[in-house]
Structures are given as C-alpha cells and as structure tokens.
Amino acid sequence: MKALVLSGGKGTRLRPLTFTCAKQLIPVANKPILGYVLDQVAATGIKQVGVITAPETGQYVKDYVNDGSKWNLSVDYIPQEPLGLAHAVKTARPFLAQDSFVMCLGDNVTGKGLNTFVQKFQKEHLDALIILKEVGNPSSFGIAQLDVEGNIVRLVEKPKTSMGNLAIIGTYLFSSKVHEAIAKIKPSWRGELEITDAIQEMINMGFKVKAEILNS
C-alpha cells in the first residue's frame, strides 16, 4: 500500500497567511499541519508516499518534507494543476501503479489516525473506504448516503436538498479499481474531475465501497 498526500491548492481563504507559504505548512502547536499528516501515514507502516504539489507552493512543500527521511518515508513529488481530486489521482497513476493507497489532504488530520482505516480496508478486501463525519452544514460538503450495512449507495457534492449530514472529510482508501472509475467520468460544471463522481462510478460499477464514520 502507498499513500497520496494532496498538498496543492492556493489557500486563498487563508490569505494573508498563505502569501508566503503553502496552507499545509501553517503551524499548529509549532508544527506544520503537513507534518502531522506524514506522522499518521508513517504510523501505518506505509513507506512510499506521493506528494501532490501546486506550481505556486510546491517548492515550500519540498523544502519542508525534503526526501521524507525525517518520517522514514520515501517521497515522490507529483506536480498537478488544480483540476480536481480525481485528476490528482489520474496524474499520480504512474506512481501509484496497481497498488492500493490511502489518499489524504495535506491540511487535514483525523483525530484517531489512519491505522484503523487501513486495517478495515485490508481485512474486508474493500475497493474504497471513505471517511465520513456528521456536520451541521451539509450543503457545504460532499454528502454520502449509506445502507444498513455501511455501504455507500449515493454521493452528492454540496447537495441543494436534504439527504443527510454525513460529510466526506478528505480521507480515502482505494484499490486500483478507482482508476477504472476515473477513466469513465467527465469534468464537472466547474471543470474539475470530482472524486465524488469517481466514487459514485465505483458504486455504479458494483465495486465494494464502504464508509467509516468518525465519532470525534
């Protein structure tokens, strides 16, 4: 298993802090958020990490992470234009090859780490495991609907009508079958390849897509 850490984006909502650094490098308790993300990746035993970078901030990320040896990781840098999370996976295909992988945002840390998610994904032989959390403003997120067994049956990006409050928070685990789904989707109205569309396509194709709901 590999990891794909998304460290692109311009961080416009965090300006002026992001005029001189990537948003993933903003410190929390004197440590960049990206450092915590890499801590969690390393704790799973994963060794190979692809870091998606943006043209504007990629060098800042490289200067901090370097070769990844600080975390006992081997890091490949993958430049990408901001064309959606599924496009990031598509861009990273040469690095990912046929391996399963954890994908997480470089500015987003889960309180319980990644180990339990990796264990569930591998034990149940899943094609996708999507981490969800209840939110109070579902119209601002991608929202998932589940069946009684915890399988995801439908995903909608920023729904205009009520369909629950289980939001996608930016942590995903995929088998190589995600590439088949990405090959079938088209850009959304905003010109991006959406990861929600790719996951929905996996569901439509009959792949095993489950959810894990965070309680904290």
Please report, for each region that a protein language model flagged, where it lies by residue.
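Alpha-helix/helix-capping structural signal
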Residues: 9, 56, 176-177
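Ligand/cofactor pocket segment of small-molecule handling proteins
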Residues: 136, 140, 145-154
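Conserved donor-nucleotide/metal-binding helix-loop-beta segment in metal-dependent transferases, i.e.
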Residues: 112-140
